[in-house]
């Protein structure tokens, strides 16, 4: 029972039989349109966001299964802000502001895919991404918020750990 795994990054709810998907799975002998339909169904909640998808094909039976990953942190931040692109000069240009609650929401979505053991550290990882995108948090530079988290200013947000 040989299995082939194809990993691609698709736009949520808008996968097509064209590149990168079609050329990657076509030679494996599965119905490409069926795969595309199932991917679009499973990624519709991530509409417009780049989503990592694994297509696992059993090359003998031609059966397939789809595993949908979590979009990159940058995509989740952009969706939360309702913006298309991050800052071109992140240290000089601000493209949006998130509340700490929004950052915590993103960290909870990504926590399983992160290297962090605690929610507090996952939030600090998301804050680092905010800094590289030109996004402020609570109207402040994300590095400042990270220092405040270390100092215990926001401990009430992390009590459930």
UniProtKB/Swiss-Prot annotation:
Oligomer status and interactors: Part of the ribosomal stalk of the 50S ribosomal subunit. Interacts with L10 and the large rRNA to form the base of the stalk. L10 forms an elongated spine to which L12 dimers bind in a sequential fashion forming a multimeric L10(L12)X complex.
- Keywords recorded for this protein, A-Z: Ribonucleoprotein, Ribosomal protein, RNA-binding, rRNA-binding
Record's protein name: Large ribosomal subunit protein uL11
The processes (GO biological process) annotated in the record are: translation
Keyword Repressor set for record: no
The entry assigns this protein to a family as follows: Belongs to the universal ribosomal protein uL11 family.
The Gene Ontology CC terms held by the record are:
large ribosomal subunit
The record's function comment reads: Forms part of the ribosomal stalk which helps the ribosome interact with GTP-bound translation factors.
According to the UniProt entry, its GO molecular function terms are:
large ribosomal subunit rRNA binding; structural constituent of ribosome
Q: Which gene encodes it?
A: rpl11
Q: Name one Pfam family in it.
A: Ribosomal_L11_N
Cited Gene3D superfamilies: Ribosomal protein L11, C-terminal domain, Ribosomal protein L11/L12, N-terminal domain
Q: Which HAMAP family match?
A: Ribosomal_uL11
Q: Which SUPFAM superfamilies match?
A: Ribosomal L11/L12e N-terminal domain, Ribosomal protein L11, C-terminal domain
InterPro entries according to UniProt: Ribosomal_uL11, Ribosomal_uL11_C, Ribosomal_uL11_C_sf, Ribosomal_uL11_CS, Ribosomal_uL11_N, Ribosomal_uL11_N_sf
**Highest taxon of the lineage:** Archaea
Its source organism is Methanocaldococcus jannaschii (strain ATCC 43067 / DSM 2661 / JAL-1 / JCM 10045 / NBRC 100440) (Methanococcus jannaschii)
